[in-house]
């Protein structure tokens, strides 16, 4: 068919400008026939490929839009989770501060109570030691008083008075011993 078209084109060129109606009709028929063949064998598949390509692009656009929406949704969820995490962290910090303050107050109160207890125990110990010292002092004073009194009595009594006292004492002991 192509060969026929070439022959017609060469024949028209050989006629040097003369219009040959047979050649025109032949070229017209060949053109129409070529268009029909192109439509049947090339245009349909070409349009099918174009349609597939268009559908593929539309599908890709739809998928990209869905992925974009999913990404936006995921981003919003992540932002919300981050916001919640920050709020939880803030709450935890506030609770930790409150707990630390409460523990500090408990420790201070406990330390004050312990200091007061130690102070009271020290006062009691001091008072007990003071009483012991006073008792020991009284004993020493009493012992010294007896010693001084005995020394004074020894000096004031004559030897004869001392003998009478000793004999009276021995007699009293014998009476007590005999009374048993």
Curated annotation (Swiss-Prot):
Belongs to the ATPase B chain family. F-type ATPases have 2 components, F(1) - the catalytic core - and F(0) - the membrane proton channel. F(1) has five subunits: alpha(3), beta(3), gamma(1), delta(1), epsilon(1). F(0) has three main subunits: a(1), b(2) and c(10-14). The alpha and beta chains form an alternating ring which encloses part of the gamma chain. F(1) is attached to F(0) by a central stalk formed by the gamma and epsilon chains, while a peripheral stalk is formed by the delta and b chains. Gene3D superfamilies: F1F0 ATP synthase subunit B, membrane domain. This is ATP synthase subunit b. It comes from Geobacillus thermodenitrificans (strain NG80-2). The gene is atpF. One of its GO terms (cellular component) is proton-transporting ATP synthase complex. It is found in: Cell membrane. InterPro entries: ATP_synth_B-like_membr_sf, ATP_synth_b/b'su_bac/chlpt, ATP_synth_F0_bsu_bac, ATP_synthase_B_chain. One of its GO terms (molecular function) is proton-transporting ATPase activity, rotational mechanism. It comes from the Bacteria. It is a single-pass membrane protein. CDD domains: ATP-synt_Fo_b.
